[in-house]
Amino acid sequence: MLVMIIEHFRNGDPKPVYARFRERGRLAPEGLKYVSSWVTDDLARCYQVMECEDRSLLDQWMAAWSDIVEFEVIPIVTSAEAAKRAS
């Protein structure tokens, strides 16, 4: 399962997020794969693609950040998969 995670940094402040990342890493449990991410120019939001087979791994990861990040989770598919489904 691929998911697009939209992270809204609490109070629009990325500093606590990047400080924790430097200190503790991504905090992703075994089985949750980071694919890639992009951050808005104003550093208020991050768009991140993650992959896992077990939704509870994603929930565990989000719980480790939920005090400083608000999350939106959107299931996604690749363009190739979308084309196949649309045929």
PLM features per residue range, with description:
Residues D13-P14, D67-V69:
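A short local loop/turn or secondary-structure capping micro-motif enriched for an aromatic residue
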Residues E51-C52, A64:
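Conserved catalytic core of Hanks-type protein kinase domains
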Residues L58-W65:
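Short, electropositive alpha-helical surface patch
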